[in-house]
Curated annotation (Swiss-Prot):
Residues recorded with modification Phosphoserine: S250
Domain of life: Eukaryota
Chain ranges passing through the membrane: none
UniProt domain Calpain catalytic: residue ranges: 1014-1321
Compositional bias of kind Polar residues: 246-255, 371-385, 528-541, 860-871
Protein name, UniProt field: Calpain-D
EC code(s) of this entry: 3.4.22.-
Span of the signal peptide: none
Amino acid sequence: MGTISSVLQWSCTKCNTINPTESLKCFNCGTVRKVFPQQQQQQHRSSSITASWTADDALEQEQAEKGQERDKEKGRAAVARSEYKHVYKSLLRGCLKRPQRNSQNLPANCVDCEDTRKYIKSSIELYRHFSNPALNRRWVCHACGTDNSSVTWHCLICDTVSYLAPIYKDAIAADRGQDLAGSLGNRGELLAADHSHPHHHHHYLHQELEEQHQHQLHSQHLHKRHLKGRSASGSGSGPGSGSGLRRTQSLSTAIDKSASGRSCHICYANNQSKDIFNLPQIKPAPQLTGIPPVAACSNSRFAIANDTFCRRKQNNNNKNQNHKVVRESGAKRKYNFTITTLSRSAAKDAGHGQMKPLRQVVNLNLNLQQEPQQKSPANPQQLQRKTQREPAAVSMNPTQFTIPRNGVFIAVNEWSEPMASSSSVSSSSNHHHHHHSNSNSNSSGNSNIINNNSSSSSGSNKLYENECVALAQQQLRAAAAQAAQAAATAVAIASSPSAKAMAEPAPTATMPIYAQVNKQHKLKKKQQIASESQTNNNTGSGEIADAVSESLTAGLGTSTDGSGEASESESQVEEHSIYAKVWKGPRKATESKIMHDPGSSSRLSGAASAAAGTASAGAIAAAVGAAAASRHDNKTQLGNGSRSKMWICIKCSYAYNRLWLQTCEMCEAKAEQQQQQLQLQQQQQQQQQHHHHHLQQQQAEAPRDEPWTCKKCTLVNYSTAMACVVCGGSKLKSISSIEDMTLRKGEFWTCSHCTLKNSLHSPVCSACKSHRQPQLSMAMEAVRERPDGQSYEEQDAAAVGGGGGSAHQSGANEVKAPTALNLPLTSVALPMPMLQLPTSTAAGLRGSRSPSPRMQLLPSLQQQRNSSSSGAIPKRHSTGGSIVPRNISIAGLANYNLQQGQGVGSASVVSASGAGSGAGAVGASTSTKKWQCPACTYDNCAASVVCDICSSPRGLASAVLGEALGRKSVRVALTPADIRQESKLMENLRQLEETEALTKWQNIIQYCRDNSELFVDDSFPPAPKSLYYNPASGAGEGNPVVQWRRPHEINCDGGAYPPWAVFRTPLPSDICQGVLGNCWLLSALAVLAEREDLVKEVLVTKEICGQGAYQVRLCKDGKWTTVLVDDLLPCDKRGHLVYSQAKRKQLWVPLIEKAVAKIHGCYEALVSGRAIEGLATLTGAPCESIPLQASSLPMPSEDELDKDLIWAQLLSSRCVRFLMGASCGGGNMKVDEEEYQQKGLRPRHAYSVLDVKDIQGHRLLKLRNPWGHYSWRGDWSDDSSLWTDDLRDALMPHGASEGVFWISFEDVLNYFDCIDICKVRSGWNEVRLQGTLQPLCSISCVLLTVLEPTEAEFTLFQEGQRNSEKSQRSQLDLCVVIFRTRSPAAPEIGRLVEHSKRQVRGFVGCHKMLERDIYLLVCLAFNHWHTGIEDPHQYPQCILAIHSSKRLLVEQISPSPHLLADAIISLTLTKGQRHEGREGMTAYYLTKGWAGLVVMVENRHENKWIHVKCDCQESYNVVSTRGELKTVDSVPPLQRQVIIVLTQLEGSGGFSIAHRLTHRLANSRGLHDWGPPGATHCPPIENVHGLHAPRLIT
């Protein structure tokens, strides 16, 4: 914007203040700018008449004009000096900035630069007024009279352009070209006549040239550019008529520049005085023989260029320095530099000028001037005549003007200058253009510069600001006429022999651009872009000119110059054919080139110029033919020419980069990167074309008269059918021999980068271009991880090596794809496990692997267990043993089982295969010397059948493998979203789920409305199966439910008023229990009713639904679910509700009850329960149960209850508004029914805890019976004498209410079993993970990452048991343990952090403050280990819910094989009771809070075993993880072992544990007389190795 603001300004004639063009008044004095000269309007009106003149009339007018003009010039010479002084005085004062420090030294008149050169050299600066984008322009539209005040130059009413709008200089040239369009239409006939009379025209032309030369010398002192008057002739060729818009110029390279290397012009000095910077005086140029002299305007212009100069200092405060540098860069090694800058059309000229060195340009033009004299002396005379008749502006050499391309042209009233137009170029492109060389030397020693100015004799009128609207309308009208003229000219060229020398391009209408600024958006490398663009155009024109350049060398040179001129005029059409209303930001450099082909006009112009300069008629005809062919080719390319010359950048996706550019215009990425992509696309296209051609050829070669068989359905079709008449299959695909392109197994290799399957013969991936890696590296990269830490490939390769050459040879013929298995044994440098078994085939080794544990694995494992426990020791062999190794794959194990079934021992197999090959035997002997114990990781000798340290048998590995496979099968079913999660705000999760549920509900409502139906839930229909487990027996006698009614059909005591509502300020007293024994749910609802917001969160549908569809959000077994129910409720024969209801005709109680019944299967499933279950279901919050009885503890404890601690917990829970419920007479309490009834209590009943108070030393609790009646009758009852007036007013201000009572804390401890607390919090985060409680191992293991200290609640849920009857229910014992861990990659059990109680309940939980660290969560359950569940889909499911005050990261991982044993050992060491049985031996017992017993023995002896006998046979209602209640084990030295884990079987009944521990020291691992021979554990621990395997003391 800086450069543009420097030219969009005008000088006040009164005070010389510089004002921006947008302002119509002077900022300083208020003088109104003059914009309507009357003389210009008259000239404008005359311009419209000029266009209609013929060429003959124009010639006569030119001759008359010359005589009149010479008479007038003498009179004008006297006043010329005063006129140009007046003009430049105002310009100089406007452009000069007077510095404050030198204002007193500034002369009053700055016209004479000689008097002020010292001051000018030191203080002249170009004043630039910075643009104000928010400046509003106020002007009156001349068309409709609207007073406009906006930033645009267009009227808001009629869209008329303002007469004040600035315009570009190119629009002036376009206007002149259109004015001459009519007069030049018949010029072809005149030119043809000139060729037929060369002598006559030579004499006439020579006379005019002499007069022109005399007038040229005289016009050097008159400065015709400043004359206001102009002849009415529109096409006169006299030198006196060649006045135009005058632009001040500067010599950018002729002086010693400032430090910044920038210069410009401001003031004017006449050519009679010496130049203030020692510029040479202009001398009359010698006239060469046969060369037409340059017009007066040309010399005058060059004289002014030498006499005009200004100096601009570097302005450090100028904000447009970067833009100035770009402007000056285009002006290097050039003479003339105008303040009225060109637009982007000058880019091509500037670039073309830079292509040639200055000396080369001089020599080229001199040669072009001399060659026509030598070869064709008559042609210059003819051309002299024609040159005077034609506008000379077409010969403007690009080396003369290098003008910045960023800017606009401001039309000054009294200035004019010749411009090249499209019409003048097209009409004169068939002539030689001889340029007068005027060489001058300056003080800087620059090279000679060609000044090829030509006087313009066109009749184009001056363009002023008030002509903008007329010009726009005239351009539109002239477009159609020029298009018709182009067609007529093409026909004349093709038909007329005399017109063969003409090949002018069709003139294109040029639309002016108004008020469009900052057109060049890309300033960087614009000279290079322009140069490349011009080079491309010259190349295109040179191709046509080569056809005729052999006979005349000048033809080629003229063709090149002509192409530059044509590209200049064409660029005006291309660049300025946009009518811009307002400036909408910088345009891209290639924006105007999208719809135009820049090579079209240049090629035509070059061909025509070459043809015109050729004497041979045959060469001319050839050139015309070449031009016509070029025109025809270009017509076919115009449609896609822009896209075919563009390339797309793969880095930034910019699609309009010109083809000749080496870098992207947007991101400057190199175009070399596109070559590979283009080549690839070409190859693909060629392949597709070849394939298509091949198919067509085969179809053509196929016999036409024979039937063909469809490949899809095998139907024989007639030969005339092109598709199968049955299945529509293609005939071409059926008869062709082209196979399917899909690569089959063994015919491809997989890319390691993009996983694309490529053909084997392709060394490079066709997608990512990655090279194919060697087979060995590919095999190494595809290492698959085993559950036990090693890879399948390691033991596969080891199996091949152990098997020797026979195994390798047998598998080599079956494997097609190259793998590591069929490579030479010496090249496969893979790590070998200690002992491996051979495989039959490599294909079987890879193909039979499966994650499922049910693949005929268990029978063989059982056989192995029996053989290992029998004590039979196989025959020793140096190459192997009879026990299945630890590191063996599934396929290897299957092969091993197959070999066992054939009666072949593994030892003999290894021996036989090892003898097959020498290399194989060596590999087998080196890899089987030792084997690693899976229990203690000790490397044992190959001859040992049991571990030398822990005495674990080799067969233990098979059990470990089966356990790992089971874990893997379960883990495969988990999705990545289930494995790794992040905790989220509970409120956000609720809103998200409600939004999803609302969409489903709206669809149902819309369906019901469209069909005029009421919603009926078919998944929970109004039928007996929704009431009972067994509908047949339950629907018999005593069934109170007779019918199902909707709310408006239910009979109520209050009648029809008030209407039914979902909520009416829910209160605990509104709940009324029905005949169903679901007090646990209603007591939880009563607690929820204390907080209305919690009740409304449960019911998603909070308003009455006319269609009867409601949604309830519940948390079943730890997982949130939205339940959809209808409003059909069970009623008796009188129409009253049978089950729970709410007073005041509210629906929230029966609807919630029905939703809970639906998720559990039926209403009968709601019978009996605990309030904590109801609270967890309704809120989903973590819950805790505080036992109030010693018998309620999970394990009888000698410690008494801490009553004060319990009371403190109740008080604190009430303070934070936790929800609480009390269980009366439940659990293991001994209940006296009569005593409870006398006290007003119901045993096995749930009550709501409404308040907890410690007042005046009394500990009181406020309870409520869900029945709404039957209250407490003991101490602190409503009629108790313990109440004082103060206490009654404080605690019962509204008096007694039915079902609500106060009771002392002591009575609660006596009559109640426990108090359940629901920890409802706001602003907490939650995450819920789903897992499986697999028997015989621990599968639910979670890695927890705490990023900042947080308070956390952990709750482990199991699947609900209410879906089945009580007799079929069996709950698991649950426990969740939290450990610290060090490495997240390989987590191991660390220090114990916290654990929950192990209880046989629906869920257990614990609470802990966690620091920033990594934790390991282990979920435990034991009482289902020996239930015989084999189907993984029948394994019990669990959900781990984690609530935290801060956000957490959780990830489900696969536990290590011994993680369960390490967890129990760590837990027992921390929480268990320690018993020193003997020296070096310690026994640990874990009973408290464990719902069973854990016995763990530690052997600290270094070289002695400890035999331990544990007898628990007197216990009842417990189960053992060993499968038996009596165990015998041999604990190795320096190791610990979990001996037995006893678990409560039924949670409702009590249990008893009696254990007796006997131990002794031994010098060997065997049990001797305590067990079978050779046994170390009885019963064996293979099935439970993960829990009962000995572990090293760490």
